[in-house]
Amino acid sequence: MKNIFVTLFLLVVTMSGFAQDKFQLSTHILDISKGQWAPNVLVQLEKKQNSSWIKVGENYTDQNGRIKDFLKMNTSNTGIYKLTFQVKPYFENQKMNSFYPFIEVVFEIKDNEHYHVPITLS
C-alpha cells in the first residue's frame, strides 16, 4: 500500500513539472549585509535592438529573492540583454542608505541553455 502512495505521489510531481512553462532566464539577489535573500525588488529585462533597449518584461523578486520566469524557452531568445535591479527602494524599506540607485547587468544569450544571473548586495 505504501508503494502505491509513493508511486502516485511521484507521478503527480512529475506531471506537474510537465505542465509548467520552462524559462531560459532566472535571477536572484542575496543581501550579504543581512545574510538573507532580497525580496520585493523590481527587476526589469530589456533586449538590445540596434542602438536601443526594448523592454521585454519586469517582475519583483519573490520571498526567496528569486525570479524564475524571464524568457520562455520555446522562442528564439538569442541576443544582448540587460537586467536592471531597482535596489534603492529595497534599501529604503530596510531603513538603509544605498550607494547604488540601481544595478545593471548586461549579458548575451547565444543558445537555448538556461542562464542564471545572481547578484549580491551589501
Residue ranges: model-predicted function:
Residues 42-46, 82-84:
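Beta-strand signatures of extracellular beta-sandwich domains
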Residues 20, 60-62, 76-78, 98, ...:
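Surface-exposed coil/turn segments at beta-strand junctions on protein surfaces, enriched
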Residues 50-56, 98-99:
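Short beta-strand and strand-turn-strand segments in soluble, beta-rich domains
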Residues 61-72:
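Glycine-centered loop-to-beta-strand initiation motif
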Residues 5-39, 47, 53:
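Beta-strand-rich domain onsets/edges
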Residues 40, 56-58, 70:
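Residue-level detector of high-confidence beta-strand sites
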Residues 80-122:
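Feature of secretome-associated and extracellular-like proteins
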